[in-house]
Regions:
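Residue(s) in the substrate-gating loop at a strand-loop-helix junction
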Residues: 141
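Alpha-helical segment proximal to the catalytic Tyr-Lys
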Residues: 126, 170-171
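Conserved glycine-rich cofactor-binding loop
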Residues: 9, 16-17
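Substrate-binding pocket helix/loop in short-chain dehydrogenase/reductase
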Residues: 97-98, 105-110, 136, 217
Length: 264
């Protein structure tokens, strides 16, 4: 199967590192012009340099803006008024006992992980429907369906994002625009390395820490390892393609078999 995204513009929120940057790399490799986003201009410069090293000749736009705010979305819109592919990847996570999560933290998690995606969909979906083509993907998590006791606030936001996905898919029905979620499992990023250290201790070598984390905290995984960000990028490339035109309103999994279900 040959996937060619030449002529498409793809916006990936929260793409200065980790999963977001890996998604941008794979979309660029497939021919899309990619829009990198983050709050730090210096981090975005580094991300752009890394992407161009991995994908020479890639077409890249960099927009420093906090997309967890309405003002940040306005800044983005002024630079990138139309996109063909929207990947809502922006998100925060962290471990905290349930009773220690105060109102401000609950609110912050919702604003960053859910409301940012809603704003971007509201911003870009109308032009997609007018053009008769568009792809929207929301990066969710196994925590949406297997709520971890150490971060129920994060799990709540990812469950909400599944509902947002299905609802906007219905709103876009028959327009040529598809809207999907991608449920990702434990993924090897710098942020997850820090998270693993919080749970199993920072005195272990990485290979041992990863193995301990998977055994003690994610034993349901069928692959027994962290997922590589590129593996998520591969799914996003498919969902962004013409070949995925009949796939919408769903929650596709790149979770290493972590979620114990035969559906989807």
């Amino acid at each position: 199967m040959n996937i060619d995204l030449d002529g498409r513009t793809a916006l990936i929120s929260g793409s200065s590192q980790g999963i977001g940057l890996a998604i941008a790399n794979e979309l660029a490799r497939a021919g899309a012009r990619v829009v990198l986003n983050g709050r730090s201009a210096s981090a975005l410069d580094s991300a752009e340099e890394q992407l161009l090293t991995e994908v020479p000749g890639a077409r890249v736009i960099v927009v420093a803006a906090d997309l967890a705010t309405a003002e940040g979305v306005e800044t983005l819109l002024a630079t990138v008024p139309v996109v063909d592919i929207l990947v809502n990847n922006l998100g925060i996570f962290g471990a905290k006992p349930a009773l220690d999560i105060d109102d401000d933290e609950w609110r912050r998690y919702f604003e960053v992980n859910v409301l940012s995606a809603i704003r971007l969909i509201r911003t870009y979906l109308p032009a997609m429907t007018e053009a008769g083509w568009g792809r929207i993907q929301n990066i969710c998590s196994d925590s949406a369906v297997v709520i971890p006791e150490e971060m129920i606030h994060y799990g709540m936001t990812k469950t909400a994002l599944l509902a947002v996905t299905r609802g906007f898919a219905k709103a876009a029905a028959g327009t040529g625009v598809t809207v999907n979620s991608v449920i990702v499992g434990p993924t090897h990023t710098e942020g997850v390395e820090k998270f693993v250290a919080e749970l199993v201790g920072d005195d272990l070598p990485w290979d041992e820490a990863q193995a301990t984390f998977m055994k003690e905290h994610r034993p349901q995984s069928l692959i027994g390892r962290l997922i590589e960000p590129k593996e998520i990028g591969n799914m996003i490339v498919y969902l962004s393609s013409e070949q995925a035109s009949a796939t919408t309103g769903g929650a596709l999994r790149v979770d290493g078999g972590y979620v114990d279900s035969i559906l989807p």
